[in-house]
C-alpha cells in the first residue's frame, strides 16, 4: 500500500471507525460534515485518491459504496501509533497507551517519526503547536539545548523547549503566559521521550 497523506489517513481511520461502530461505511456527506469539508464532492476526491492507493474500493451507485481492501484490513495495527493518556511508570509506547494507528509514512518526517502524540493545552502556540494537533515524535533519550522535546517529569508528559544548565533542566513554553518548568536532576526524575519532528493539524501538514 502506498504511503498516505495525513488527510487521507484521517479519512481512512474515519471509515474504519464507522464500520466498526455501525457496521457500514460513512456517506460522502457524513465524511464532509465530520472533517469540515465544504461539500461532499471534496470528500469524493479524497476517496478517489484512497482508491488509487489501494486502500478502498468505490462501488458506484450507492451513497455508502465504500469497501476496505483486504490489504488495509490486514494492516490495521501498523503505521504510526497515536499515544493517548500515559500511565505513570509505563513506557510511552506501551500497547495500552495506543489509541489508534495512522497510515502515515514515518519517513515523511526528518528524522523519521516513531509515534504521534495529541497536543493538550496552548503552551507551545507561538511556534504553531496547538491544542488538538498531532505531534510527530522521533524517539530519543537525549536532547540538545533548543530542541523541542516530549519529556516526562515525575510521570507527567509535556512538550517543551529543552535547556540544560549543569544539573538543572529548564523546559520552556512558547507562550508568555507560562513559566519554565525547572527540573533539578539531583532529586527529580526527567525522561526524554522524543523530539518533535512535525505537526499534523486537522489532517494537513504544517
From Swiss-Prot:
EC number from the UniProt entry: 3.4.21.88
Catalytic activity, as annotated: Hydrolysis of Ala-|-Gly bond in repressor LexA
Active site residues per record: 123, 160
Residue ranges: DNA binding: 28-48
Family statement drawn from the similarity comment of this UniProt entry: Belongs to the peptidase S24 family.
HAMAP family in the record: LexA
Subunit-level organization: Homodimer.
Protein name according to UniProt: LexA repressor
Amino acid at each position: 500500500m502506498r504511503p498516505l497523506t495525513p488527510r487521507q489517513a484521517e479519512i481512512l481511520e474515519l471509515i474504519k471507525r464507522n464500520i466498526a461502530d455501525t457496521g457500514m461505511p460513512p456517506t460522502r456527506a457524513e465524511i464532509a460534515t465530520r472533517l469540515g469539508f465544504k461539500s461532499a464532492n471534496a470528500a469524493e476526491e479524497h476517496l478517489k485518491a484512497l482508491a488509487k492507493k489501494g486502500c478502498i474500493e468505490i462501488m458506484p451507485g450507492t451513497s455508502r459504496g465504500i469497501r476496505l481492501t483486504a490489504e488495509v484490513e490486514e494492516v490495521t495495527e501498523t503505521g504510526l501509533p497515536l499515544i493517548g493518556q500515559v500511565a505513570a511508570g509505563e513506557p510511552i509506547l506501551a500497547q495500552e497507551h495506543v489509541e489508534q494507528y495512522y497510515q502515515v509514512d514515518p519517513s515523511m518526517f526528518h528524522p523519521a517519526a516513531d509515534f504521534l502524540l495529541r497536543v493538550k493545552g496552548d503552551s507551545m502556540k507561538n511556534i504553531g503547536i496547538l491544542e488538538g494537533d498531532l505531534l510527530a515524535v522521533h524517539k530519543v533519550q537525549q536532547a540538545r539545548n533548543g530542541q523541542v522535546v516530549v519529556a516526562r517529569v515525575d510521570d507527567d508528559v509535556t512538550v517543551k523547549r529543552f535547556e540544560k544548565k549543569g544539573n538543572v533542566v529548564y523546559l520552556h513554553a512558547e507562550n508568555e503566559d507560562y513559566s519554565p518548568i525547572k527540573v533539578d536532576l539531583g532529586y527529580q526524575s526527567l525522561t526524554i521521550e522524543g523530539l518533535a519532528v512535525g505537526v499534523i493539524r486537522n489532517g494537513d501538514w504544517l
